[in-house]
Amino acid sequence: MTDVDKKDPQYKQIFLERFRKKLQSDKTGMSDLESFVELPEGITPVAASIGPIKRGSEPLPPWLKLNVPKGMTHRPRFNRIRRSMREKKLSTVCEEAKCPNIGECWGGGEDNGAATATIMVMGSHCTRGCRFCSVLTSRRPPPLDPDEPEKVAAAVHEMGVDYIVMTMVDRDDLPDGGASHVSRCIRTIKEQNPELMLEALVGDFHGDLKVVEQLAATPLSVYAHNIECVERITPRVRDHRATYKQSLQTLEHVTKWTNGKMLTKSSIMLGLGEEEEEVRQTLRDLRTAGVSAVTLGQYLQPSRTRLKVSRYAHPKEFEMWEKEAMSMGFLYCASGPMVRSSYRAGEYYIKNIVKQRENAKGATTMEAVTAADAVAAGA
């Protein structure tokens, strides 16, 4: 529009009118953005859109529309956990990720003695940029809080929960990935809460097995590391520093190094473009690595900048995967659309497995651990 001065008050209106006419007179037979914009190589028109960005191409299916229980904020245990976290300025994945199961987990103790909460340590900024995760990313996050282990331990004591899940952000900027800090958090929590069952959901620490051993040597009840998705789509879904084989190696090493006495756990998301046989193979790979507990849940896009959902798996499919996982030899499997890696982590069955394995810690063979698992299964 070289014939119209940009300073002209009518410039915008004239431009829009001419652009509309160009769209109407298009003779290419194409009516999308590709007709008017030369996109860079490797970028398809699907990657660009005009208008409001939607969180998914389809509306949520009915099984993902939950009714929030009324009166949850008036339940004593729910409020006690929330108040303790606020006062000590600590973060929970339950709130950060807007988990739909927060009421069931935090208030669980009032119904079945299995209240759980998930605390995130080492700050709120991660050095990795997985495309499914909503946690903030930074190359140089703020320094660690040296008082965090004591704060977390005190908060856990005040919560009065039976089972705590402690997760972490990746800190590739630190020499040991933050393992020494996480280890101190674990030991401090257990010192102040000796009867508590503690699950640590940790990263891969670049596959440094010595660092993995450092964490496995702490008084943990469950060592968890999520494989997240099937192998084929891992490069697209996870940060390039997190690989499928590295995750399997981490989990397998914990099992072997502890002679099977440490319960290992992992999680798989559905709805990222995986095929049925790929999910089955991932379960096989986890079981071969010695993983005893697994969860499967529906991936939901946390923000506009994250990966879109490829499909919504039906509840019947999740039931199928639970049956298959148990038939493969997993001791525990939680599988459902709203299941997350820490979902009802402290429920009776998994707690019983942990107790039986702790009783078998004096044993020196895998057979003794297997016998303990059999006792737990029959409880």
UniProtKB/Swiss-Prot annotation:
Its main location: mitochondrion. Gene3D superfamilies: Aldolase class I. It catalyses: [[Fe-S] cluster scaffold protein carrying a second [4Fe-4S](2+) cluster] + N(6)-octanoyl-L-lysyl-[protein] + 2 oxidized [2Fe-2S]-[ferredoxin] + 2 S-adenosyl-L-methionine + 4 H(+) = [[Fe-S] cluster scaffold protein] + N(6)-[(R)-dihydrolipoyl]-L-lysyl-[protein] + 4 Fe(3+) + 2 hydrogen sulfide + 2 5'-deoxyadenosine + 2 L-methionine + 2 reduced [2Fe-2S]-[ferredoxin]. The keyword Heme does not apply. PROSITE patterns: RADICAL_SAM. [4Fe-4S] cluster 2 binds at residues 126, 130, 133. [4Fe-4S] cluster 1 binds at residues 94, 99, 105, 342. It is an enzyme of class 2 (transferase). It comes from the Eukaryota. GO terms for cellular component: mitochondrion. Pfam families: LIAS_N (PF16881), Radical_SAM (PF04055). Disulfide bonds: none annotated. One of its GO terms (molecular function) is metal ion binding. It is found in: Mitochondrion. Keywords: 4Fe-4S, Iron, Iron-sulfur, Metal-binding, Mitochondrion, S-adenosyl-L-methionine, Transferase. Its EC number is 2.8.1.8. SMART domains: Elp3 (SM00729). Binds 2 [4Fe-4S] clusters per subunit. One cluster is coordinated with 3 cysteines and an exchangeable S-adenosyl-L-methionine. Its cofactor is [4Fe-4S] cluster. Pathway: Protein modification; protein lipoylation via endogenous pathway; protein N(6)-(lipoyl)lysine from octanoyl-[acyl-carrier-protein]: step 2/2. NCBIfam families: lipA, PRK05481.1, PRK12928.1. PANTHER family: LIPOYL SYNTHASE, LIPOYL SYNTHASE, MITOCHONDRIAL. This protein may be expected to contain an N-terminal transit peptide but none has been predicted. Belongs to the radical SAM superfamily. Lipoyl synthase family. This is Lipoyl synthase, mitochondrial. It comes from Leishmania braziliensis.
